């Protein structure tokens, strides 16, 4: 049952004096990658691969088992997106503090915004190279979870924490490019790449996390999990 930890990245911990956060890979006792170690599966990593992750999440109140600020009068979602004001934005202090912590830790956090549902927020991470991108999103999540403890809150990443209701779920949109995509300026090339996903889309969905069938319904700015599409500025497409 013993496992080994292999340090792979280190970040200063802005919250603790002279502290550091060390990202590790988990190895079996014989040195082989543990089954949970997805990082070890990355091969041919290259700084030419650019990733932009948009991580959505809910600030979750354990006492009510609902999002922070969830309306008691069942006010429908809509007014909370990119909102301001005490009737609309709940938990901005946490979001702002998380932004500062990530910046001070050297994580390339690109932005934040209030999301569609009450108590729902998003932060964005950019990195060059798959391993670095994964390291930064995981460490940013860790900082967020630890920060929420100070407020007696949890961070909820479930794709559809409010179930089959008229409230958005959470995902993590992944923006990707390489030199070809950034420089070709060819609609035909973009469409050919998107089409290459069509026969293997189920293989991708299988490793994108649990419960995505609850979120990918075709509603709330999603494509159905059983369909595949792409389009320019199409928020209901599989690939936008």
Residue ranges and their predicted role:
Residues 1-240:
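Glycine-rich, acidic/polar active-site loops that bind/position phosphate-bearing ligands
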